[in-house]
């Protein structure tokens, strides 16, 4: 599978299903994974806690990939995430992300997020723990 399909399909499985599947996350991301998002840095275990927190705070997450581009081991993504929170409110976040993939695993991400619509309290969903 090429890298951009790896990201697209992996993200659908991680985010667009209701279950928190830590085993799948561990197959997709390297244990050395580092994510820089909105001025914060998450290491692998922080990232797992982040994904678990998202599942606990939300009813559903849908990702609309506007652009996915690949150059070597790098996948650039411009996407919009629509989130239904547990209180039934909707949040939309625009995300620009650069993923680095080696040996079938994501090992690095540099990401910027911007709240498009929704409660300002949800503007940190990209890094919430």
Listing of model-derived features with the role each one plays in the protein:
Residues 12, 49-129:
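A beta-strand edge to alpha-helix "cap/lid" segment located at domain peripheries
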Residues 19, 41, 86-89:
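Alpha-helix boundary/capping and short turn/kink residues
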Residues 22-27, 36-37, 63-64, 109-110:
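Short, hydrophobic secondary-structure boundary micro-motifs
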Residues 31-43, 54:
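A short gly/proline-enriched turn/hairpin at secondary-structure junctions
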Residues 23-29, 40-41, 71-75, 129:
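Short amphipathic alpha-helical segments, especially helix-boundary/capping motifs
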Residues 1-31:
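Short acidic-aromatic low-complexity motifs
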Residues 5-9, 45-48, 52:
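Generic alpha-helical structural signal
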Residues 17, 39-46, 60:
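Generic, well-ordered alpha-helical segments
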